[in-house]
C-alpha cells in the first residue's frame, strides 16, 4: 500500500506472545503450524490470551498433525523412539491433504489407466519408505495440494493433477507403482542413492526432476538437526546431523559426495 498511517508503530513484548513453559505433557512439537496446537490440549496457549493483531498462523501441517499423534502414542519416550519419531515418513490420515487425495480417488474411472492409478492410490498406506509402491503417485498428488496451500491458492483441478501424476510416474518409473526409492533419489550426477520421505513428512524430503533425469532428486528438506539427551548422572550427549551446506558440492571439500 501507500499509506503510512496504517503501518504499525510499536512492538508486542515477548511476554505477550504465545508461549509454553514446562508443559505437563513433557513435550513441545512445533512444525510450521498454529502456535495454539503444539503440545497436549491442556498445555496449549489460548488465542484469547494473546494480541488479536499478532497474525498468528492457523494452519496445521502434516508434520504437526503426525508428530502430535505419535507423541500421544508413545507416552514416555526413549532416545531410540525419539529418533524413530523424527524420521517417520508417513502422512497422517487426519492431514488436510487427505481431502484432496479423496477428491482424486473419487474421479470417474474413465479408462484402464485412470482406474489402475486410482486403485493404487486407494490402497496406498500413506507411507514414503524406499520400498513403498504407492508413494510415487501418492506423493505427486499430495505435493500439488501442498504447493497450493503453501502459496495461498485454491487446490488445483483434481483430474489434471491425476493425469499429470500418471504421466510423470510412468515416465520416470516405467510403471504405475515403482518402488519409491527407485525414483526418489539423493545425490548428484551419476552418484545417487534411494531416499525415503516426502513433502511435509517428519522425514522431510522435497524432490523434483532435474534436466530430464529419469528420476526425482531431493533438493530440500532435512538439514541441520540435533538430538540432545541427559544421562542419569547429568552428562549431556548430543548427536547432530549436518549436510555441510554447499560445501558438499565442492570437489575440493572432504565432504564432497
Regions found by a protein language model. Give the residues of each.
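C-terminal/peripheral segments of proteins
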Residues: 1-96, 103, 107-110, 119, ...
Amino acid at each position: 500500500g501507500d499509506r503510512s498511517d496504517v503501518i504499525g508503530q510499536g512492538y508486542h513484548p515477548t511476554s505477550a506472545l504465545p508461549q509454553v513453559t514446562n508443559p505437563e505433557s513433557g513435550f513441545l512439537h512445533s512444525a510450521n503450524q498454529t502456535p495454539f496446537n503444539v503440545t497436549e490440549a491442556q498445555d496449549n496457549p489460548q488465542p484469547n490470551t494473546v494480541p488479536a493483531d499478532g497474525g498468528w498462523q492457523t494452519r496445521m501441517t502434516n508434520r504437526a498433525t503426525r508428530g502430535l499423534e505419535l507423541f500421544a502414542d508413545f507416552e514416555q519416550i526413549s532416545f531410540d523412539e525419539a529418533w524413530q519419531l523424527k524420521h517417520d515418513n508417513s502422512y497422517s490420515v487426519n492431514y488436510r491433504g487427505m481431502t484432496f487425495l479423496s477428491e482424486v480417488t473419487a474421479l470417474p474411472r474413465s479408462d484402464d489407466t485412470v482406474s489402475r492409478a486410482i486403485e493404487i492410490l486407494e490402497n496406498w498406506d500413506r507411507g514414503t519408505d524406499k520400498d513403498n509402491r504407492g508413494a510415487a503417485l501418492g506423493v505427486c498428488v499430495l505435493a500439488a495440494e501442498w504447493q497450493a496451500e503453501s502459496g495461498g491458492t485454491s487446490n488445483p483441478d483434481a483430474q489434471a493433477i491425476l493425469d499429470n501424476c500418471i504421466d510423470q510416474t510412468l515416465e520416470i518409473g516405467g510403471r504405475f507403482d515403482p518402488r519409491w526409492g527407485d525414483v526418489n533419489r539423493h545425490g548428484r550426477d551419476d552418484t545417487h542413492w534411494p531416499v525415503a520421505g516426502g513433502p511435509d513428512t517428519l522425514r522431510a524430503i522435497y524432490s523434483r526432476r532435474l534436466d530430464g533425469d529419469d528420476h526425482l532428486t531431493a533438493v530440500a528438506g532435512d538439514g541441520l538437526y540435533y538430538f540432545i539427551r541427559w544421562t542419569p548422572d547429568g552428562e549431556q550427549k548430543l548427536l547432530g546431523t549436518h549436510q555441510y551446506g554447499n560445501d558438499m558440492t565442492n570437489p575440493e571439500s572432504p565432504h564432497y559426495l
